[in-house]
Amino acid sequence: MSVAFAAPRQRGKGEITPAAIQKMLDDNNHLIQCIMDSQNKGKTSECSQYQQMLHTNLVYLATIADSNQNMQSLLPAPPTQNMPMGPGGMNQSGPPPPPRSHNMPSDGMVGGGPPAPHMQNQMNGQMPGPNHMPMQGPGPNQLNMTNSSMNMPSSSHGSMGGYNHSVPSSQSMPVQNQMTMSQGQPMGNYGPRPNMNMQPNQGPMMHQQPPSQQYNMPQGGGQHYQGQQPPMGMMGQVNQGNHMMGQRQIPPYRPPQQGPPQQYSGQEDYYGDQYSHGGQGPPEGMNQQYYPDGHNDYGYQQPSYPEQGYDRPYEDSSQHYYEGGNSQYGQQQDAYQGPPPQQGYPPQQQQYPGQQGYPGQQQGYGPSQGGPGPQYPNYPQGQGQQYGGYRPTQPGPPQPPQQRPYGYDQGQYGNYQQ
């Protein structure tokens, strides 16, 4: 065997032709087979000899490929032939793989490599999600694509929730809404983390990118929420279950995010969430806490706001959403009804002052909402109007806290209505 292979190899050196190279590749396949057979039989001496021969052939082919690029064009097809053997041969023939990688790489490495990256991207996007996040930065669209699919998968991963935040890119937002829907549902489990990620990311990313877009989303989305509010309710419920979970769990994040952005992004979700919250039994339960405590919880949470700073954000967020949202909704509803959503927000801020820490956020709301406020009006209008039904109960700004409960009730009812 060694002689047979050696001769062709020597001839190949003299004859750099496609036929000679192809024959050498065939010989390499035979060598790989022989190596595998010898390994299976435990003939280490023969295996080592074959490996050395194979390594020599690969080095020679690599040299030819380097000297003659045309050979590379010829090699790719053959390498694929070698590749099948490659896995066994490469693993088994330690030395050859490097040369092989040199020769084969175009096929094996490249073919394998790129797929791996794609695989990784998908894997990362889906599994790691964090990679997604990086990816997200690079390719929101891809992320959206990935997120769409990833969210679906990620939804299972929940990290996707975080990846919704990847979705959060405003582009994602629509998807996010949808994805959130999908994710939110899956995310419900992961919701907290996703929301944590999402909210932070969304808040930041969306706030950064979409804030308006989110708001646009809200506007569109708000409308979507109005139209989609049921979905939002679902999303909110799902996501917001997550958000709720995420909100409370995320609260730490929110607080950072309490910067209105995330709250906004969150708020969208939170609006949906809160609506969903309302929609969601737990949120309602929590909201119900708000309900029973609702006013108290409002007061409670307001106190707890300081305490629950984060939970406040969420609950506050909820309250922001409810209070803030409701206030925003109620106020914003008022604001929505009245152009003064921001005015509503200032009241919210005023309310928030009671809530403490919100004023800034509320301020964030005021300003951000000022922008989004109009957009939120979509929410409020959609939901606000729904709240509007509730507003009658909320009519007095004094009620904002009540509106908050109403917000919850409304949010919940909003969800129900939605």
Curated annotation (Swiss-Prot):
Region (2 X 13 AA imperfect tandem repeats): which ranges?
Answer: 344-369
Q: Where is this motif: SH2-binding?
A: 50-53, 374-377, 413-416
Q: Where are the sequence repeats?
A: 344-356, 357-369
- Motif SH3-binding mapped to chain: 392-401
Subunit composition and interactions: Interacts with MLLT10. Isoform 1 interacts with RBM14 isoform 1. Isoform 2 interacts with RBM14 isoform 1. Component of the multiprotein chromatin-remodeling complexes SWI/SNF: SWI/SNF-A (BAF), SWI/SNF-B (PBAF) and related complexes. The canonical complex contains a catalytic subunit (either SMARCA4/BRG1/BAF190A or SMARCA2/BRM/BAF190B) and at least SMARCE1, ACTL6A/BAF53, SMARCC1/BAF155, SMARCC2/BAF170, and SMARCB1/SNF5/BAF47. Other subunits specific to each of the complexes may also be present permitting several possible combinations developmentally and tissue specific.
Locate the compositionally biased regions of type Basic and acidic residues. Answer: 309-318
Q: One biological-process term from Gene Ontology? A: positive regulation of transcription by RNA polymerase II
Pro residues bias located where?
394-403
Where are the compositionally biased (Low complexity) regions?
Answer: 199-211, 225-251, 328-337, 345-366, 376-393, 404-418
Please provide, in alphabetical order, the Gene Ontology terms of the cellular component aspect for this entry: nucleoplasm
* Keyword Transcription regulation on entry: yes
Query: Segment Disordered: which positions?
Result: 76-118, 199-418
Query: Transmembrane stretches, by residue range?
Result: none
Q: Where in the cell is it found?
A: Nucleus
Residue numbers bearing the N-acetylserine modification: 2
What keywords does the record list, in alphabetical order? Answer: Acetylation, Activator, Nucleus, Repeat, Transcription, Transcription regulation
Q: What is this protein called?
A: Protein SSXT
